[in-house]
């Protein structure tokens, strides 16, 4: 969606406090989001 996985913390690739790099799917309770600093990347974030 339009959510940003790492807009509330450090960059997900270097300090995954708000998300993790997506490997094709998101774990249960997580949502797929765009990376705030890397528009072409996707990652997963815990649903709020």
UniProtKB/Swiss-Prot annotation:
At the top level of its lineage, which domain of life is listed? Eukaryota
Gene Ontology biological-process annotations? regulation of signal transduction
Give its localization: Secreted; Nematocyst
Write out the GO MF terms.
sodium channel regulator activity; toxin activity
- Keyword Disulfide bond attributed: yes
Record-annotated disulphide pairs: 3-43, 5-33, 26-44
Q: Which Gene3D superfamilies match?
A: Anthopleurin-A
Please tell me one Gene Ontology term that the record gives under cellular component: nematocyst
Q: Which SUPFAM superfamilies match?
A: Defensin-like (SSF57392)
Print the keywords alphabetically.
Amidation, Disulfide bond, Ion channel impairing toxin, Nematocyst, Neurotoxin, Secreted, Toxin, Voltage-gated sodium channel impairing toxin
Bilayer-spanning residue ranges: none
Query: Which InterPro entries does its entry note?
Result: Anenome_toxin (IPR000693), Myo_ane_neurotoxin_sf (IPR023355)
PTM note:
Delta-SHTX-Hcr1f (RTX-VI) may be the result of post-translational modification of delta-SHTX-Hcr1a (RTX-III), which would consist of Arg-13 cleavage.
As stated in the Swiss-Prot or TrEMBL entry, residues carrying the post-translational modification Lysine amide are 48
Keyword Disulfide bond in record? yes
Q: Any other comment in the entry?
A: A synonymy between H.magnifica and R.crispa is controversial.
What the record says about family reads: Belongs to the sea anemone sodium channel inhibitory toxin family. Type II subfamily.
Name of the molecule in the record: Delta-stichotoxin-Hcr1a
């Amino acid at each position: 969606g339009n959510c940003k996985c790492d807009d509330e913390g450090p960059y997900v690739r270097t300090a995954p406090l708000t998300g993790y790099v997506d490997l094709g799917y998101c774990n249960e309770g997580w949502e797929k989001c765009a990376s705030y600093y890397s528009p072409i990347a996707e990652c997963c974030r815990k649903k709020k």
